[in-house]
Curated annotation (Swiss-Prot):
Substrate binds at T12, G13, T14, G15, K16, T17. Catalyzes the transfer of a dimethylallyl group onto the adenine at position 37 in tRNAs that read codons beginning with uridine, leading to the formation of N6-(dimethylallyl)adenosine (i(6)A). The record marks T101, R124 as: Interaction with substrate tRNA. It comes from Dictyoglomus thermophilum (strain ATCC 35947 / DSM 3960 / H-6-12). Keywords: ATP-binding, Magnesium, Nucleotide-binding, Transferase, tRNA processing. It catalyses: adenosine(37) in tRNA + dimethylallyl diphosphate = N(6)-dimethylallyladenosine(37) in tRNA + diphosphate. Monomer. ATP binds at G10, P11, T12, G13, T14, G15, K16, T17. Its cofactor is Mg(2+). Residues 35-38 are annotated as: Interaction with substrate tRNA. Its EC number is 2.5.1.75. GO terms for molecular function: ATP binding; tRNA dimethylallyltransferase activity. This is tRNA dimethylallyltransferase.
């Protein structure tokens, strides 16, 4: 049985959450978070999680599901996401995938499989010490030697993925690219919606976004985690905003330096997100600066229905179509 689902993706700060909640007025959806950081409990401000009030407007899945000291793998994401998708459809609702983690989408839609190799925390600690001492490019050069195929697809500063690839090679003696063979799946009727905005406007919004997070208490959020023993050893603390403020709390950076670094790295990450997403050929892109939220939701609704029907799924809620077209 093929399941109809929709995807709202795009770089950080483009309004994916707002659109998903507006779309829920027209389409009976449950939202599945496709965000590698929102899975962690106690990390709310820096990950821009939907508020508890927002989560009452539509059911949400894969948010706050593991503690911050837990190593949440891509393979586990796929398993949990597929389970949520099946259960949502069984309840008579439509799965709406929302988030900006490209690797999660690639795995979920079967573009490649992920090896089930448990984490080696000691190995990771050694790798991070090397990166701190000799620079991130040292590890990237090592990855190029043992797994050039993966290295060609990973940004030289994407330390988390570089260390994971080296870890897999260290534990099983094979490149992760060799284990993660290509594997296409055709389980879904899919409509992919992408959000973007002009770069200058986007960067301005990103800077304001960081300032608002600081005002909301991001420093205290990081401090509380640090006092509980959650530091740079854990994957959760590698998220942008957390690792920079951790350096401030440890006296390695001033507050101004750490905030400037958060803004800089957020912009760099957004550039990489645009690069990743632009590789997909089947995304309907919308410039969010050109529409009100209500206008955009109606356009996206009709795009989703048209996509499903062009793939052979007949959407039955004619009342909903009329309401959107009014």
């Amino acid at each position: 049985m093929k399941i109809p689902l929709a995807v709202i993706l795009g770089p950080t700060g483009t309004g994916k959450t707002d659109l998903s909640l507006e779309l829920a007025k027209y389409l009976p959806v449950e939202i599945v978070s496709v965000d590698s950081m929102q899975v962690y409990q106690g990390m709310d401000i820096g990950t821009a999680k939907p508020s508890l009030e927002d989560r009452k407007r539509a059911p949400h899945h894969l948010i706050d599901i593991v503690p911050p000291d837990y190593f949440f793998t891509v393979a586990e994401f796929k398993e949990r996401a597929l389970k949520a998708i099946d259960e949502i459809y069984e309840r008579g609702h439509y799965p709406l995938l929302v988030g900006g983690t490209p690797l999660y989408y690639k795995v979920l839609f079967g573009e490649f499989s992920i090896p089930h190799v448990p984490p080696d925390l000691e190995f990771r600690k050694k790798m991070r010490e090397i990166a701190e001492r000799e620079g991130e490019y040292k590890l990237y050069e090592e990855l190029k030697k043992v797994d050039p195929k993966t290295a060609s697809k990973v940004h030289p500063r994407d330390l988390k993925r570089i260390i994971r690839a080296l870890e897999v090679y260290h534990k099983v003696g094979k490149p992760i690219s060799e284990i993660a063979g290509e594997k296409k799946e055709d389980r879904f009727f899919v409509s992919k919606i992408g959000l973007y905005m002009p770069r200058e406007l986007h960067y301005k919004i990103l800077e304001q976004r960081v300032d608002k997070m600081i005002e909301k208490g991001l420093i205290d959020e990081v401090r509380n985690l640090y006092l509980k023993g959650i530091d740079e050893r854990f994957v959760s603390m590698q998220g942008i905003g957390y690792k920079e403020l951790l350096k401030y709390l440890k006296g390695e950076l001033t507050l101004e330096e750490s905030i400037d670094l958060i803004k800089k790295r957020t912009k760099e990450f957004v550039k990489r997100q645009y690069t990743w997403f632009k590789k997909y050929k089947d995304i309907h892109w919308f410039d969010v600066s050109q529409y009100s939220l209500s206008q955009l939701a109606k356009l996206v609704y009709n795009t989703i229905i048209n996509d499903w029907e062009s793939q052979g799924y007949r959407y039955q809620d004619q009342e909903g179509v009329d309401k959107v077209n009014d």
